[in-house]
A protein has these predicted regions:
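Gly/Ala-rich beta-loop-alpha elbow adjacent to hydrolase catalytic centers
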Residues: 199-204, 208
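N-terminal targeting or regulatory segments adjacent to alpha/beta-hydrolase or S9 domains
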Residues: 2-105
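Short, surface-exposed "cap/lid" segments of acyl-processing enzymes
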Residues: 105-161
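Alpha/beta-hydrolase active-site loop signature
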Residues: 160-163, 234
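Active-site signature of alpha/beta-hydrolase-fold catalytic machinery across serine-
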Residues: 210-214
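Active-site nucleophile loop of the alpha/beta-hydrolase fold
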Residues: 228-239
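Catalytic nucleophile-loop/oxyanion-hole region of alpha/beta-hydrolase
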Residues: 163-197
Length: 242
């Protein structure tokens, strides 16, 4: 009798826990759905597919081809984003509203794009590699100072950057590494016999190290005289201390 009563109590307690847990989960799901439905819809720049962007699979084998492709992807950005925003989105703080305070096209050059600062008789060639979710803009001032000191400077826009957030969705490190190789070949062709440097910031620093190591093994790649790493996005194992 006592065992039967205890068994019944345990069963009721178990069912109470199951029902309470199920109810809590159901309420949480309802709250989550209501919360998500109350959030703003994604804007056109969150959804656009800029299919002219460079990738390691692109049949581009020259820096001139890379720049031409970049021209096409920014034309796509104009047609599929700038021209498609709603009247309510045409504010002075929306970078995709033409002529707004934050529209990068207001300035010449557009520092969200690849830039090249040439010298008639440069002392060195310098490649600037920006970080992830960044653009050449972040290294523009350094590039201008190096150019004033006699360097031929190339500020590379990494694939998927400087356009729309969707550009980063399918981006792989191999795409950025391939773009780096094209830029270095171009810099070497433009500056024969002169030392070449890479300045990398954050992820750009990791790409600089990757390229420098690859150039040691692949004689077809232009060699780097020095690399400069700014806040490098590189993990160092504790074993390195020994």
């Amino acid at each position: 009798m006592m065992m039967s009563r205890l068994s019944g109590l345990a069963r009721r307690a178990f069912l109470a826990v199951v029902y309470s847990t199920s109810g809590a989960v159901a309420v949480s799901l309802i709250v989550f759905v209501v919360y998500m439905n109350g959030r703003p819809d994604l804007a056109v720049w969150h959804l656009v597919d800029l299919d002219e962007e460079f990738s390691s699979d692109s049949k581009i084998d020259s820096f001139a081809g890379y720049v031409a492709l970049e021209e096409r992807v920014f034309k796509q950005l104009d047609e599929l984003v700038y021209a498609k925003i709603s009247p309510a989105q045409r504010t002075q703080v929306n970078r995709y509203h033409r002529g707004s305070l934050s529209d990068p096209q207001r300035w010449e050059p557009n520092w969200n794009r690849t830039f090249e600062l040439r010298k008639p008789d440069p002392r060195v060639g310098v490649l600037l590699l920006h970080g992830m979710s960044d653009s050449p803009y972040s290294l523009r001032q350094l590039g201008q100072r190096l150019h004033a000191s006699g360097a031929h400077v190339l500020g590379l826009r990494m694939p998927g950057h400087g356009t729309a957030p969707t550009g980063l969705v399918e981006l792989a490190w191999q795409d950025m590494a391939a773009a780096t190789r094209l830029a270095m070949r171009h810099l070497a062709e433009q500056n024969p016999g002169r030392p070449l440097y890479i300045v990398g910031y954050s992820t750009g620093a990791a790409l600089a190290v990757h390229y420098a190591l690859a150039a040691l093994e692949n004689q077809a790649l232009p060699r780097v005289e020095r690399i400069v790493l700014l806040s490098p996005a590189i993990g160092v194992s504790a074993v390195a201390a020994f």
